[in-house]
Design a protein with these regions (language model features):
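Conserved active-site tyrosine of GNAT-family acetyltransferases
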Residues: 137-138, 142
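A short beta-loop-alpha structural element at the N-terminal edge
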Residues: 6-23
Length: 165
């Protein structure tokens, strides 16, 4: 499938889209290179609740039939996690359905993430990534942040500044 057939849009999730979003999250998590038991144990902590989604900006990628095949969620980033004197949005989650991975959908979702960040007039986007996902974000212009407070800060934080016109 060509990525032009995929639409990317911000949404206000309802019950049906919550289920569709969580199907994408479940498929992505179950595709991780971890022991099956570990994936089953961690999966519930990655699934979204309706209450959580009300406090997040939600962006979905849909195929032409309307099926959700990717999701990105954003929230304000804590000041301690951002580079010094910077304000940012935290990319809370970025998930692509396994059958749609490696087709540019993650990049398209990130493009919309940066449009949201630009509109919010923040300095950049912060990611707390799984170690295996770091190369994906580095290839898209993110830089690894060295923890200044290893007891408090997540080890795999990445930052990309919002380009101002």
């Amino acid at each position: 499938m060509h990525t032009d057939a995929i639409s990317v849009e911000r949404v206000t999730p309802d019950g049906a889209s919550l289920d569709a979003i969580n199907r994408v999250v479940e498929g992505a998590v179950m595709g991780w290179r971890l022991a099956e038991r570990v994936k089953r144990l961690v999966l519930p902590s990655y699934l979204y609740s309706a209450a959580e989604l009300t406090s997040l900006d939600v962006i979905v990628a849909r195929e032409t039939a309307g099926m959700v095949v990717g999701v990105a969620t954003l929230e304000s980033a804590a000041a301690i996690d951002c580079p010094h004197d910077r304000r940012g949005l935290l990319l809370h989650g970025l998930y692509i359905a396994p059958a749609y991975q490696r087709r540019g959908i993650g990049k398209r979702l990130l493009d919309e993430v940066f449009a949201v960040a630009h509109a919010a007039r923040v300095d950049g986007v912060l990611v707390k990534a799984q170690h295996a996902a770091e190369p994906f974000f580095v290839a898209r212009g993110f830089t690894v942040l060295v923890p200044t407070d290893p007891q408090r800060q997540y080890a795999h934080r990445l930052w990309r500044a919002v380009r101002r016109a």
